[in-house]
Structures are given as structure tokens and as C-alpha cells.
Amino acid sequence: THLFQPSLVLDMAKVLLDN
């Protein structure tokens, strides 16, 4: 099972915002 990790989402959102 693939658990959803908030840290991963925050990191991706951070990259999107930085871009």
C-alpha cells in the first residue's frame, strides 16, 4: 500500500511555488 506522505506534498508544493 502506498501511504500518502504530507512531507512529500509539501516538498512538491514548495518546488511548484518556487518555480
Curated annotation (Swiss-Prot):
It is found in: Secreted, Extracellular space, Extracellular matrix, Interphotoreceptor matrix. GO terms for cellular component: extracellular region; interphotoreceptor matrix. Keywords: Extracellular matrix, Secreted, Transport, Vitamin A. Coiled coil: none annotated. One of its GO terms (molecular function) is retinal binding. It comes from the Eukaryota. IRBP shuttles 11-cis and all trans retinoids between the retinol isomerase in the pigment epithelium and the visual pigments in the photoreceptor cells of the retina. This is Retinol-binding protein 3.
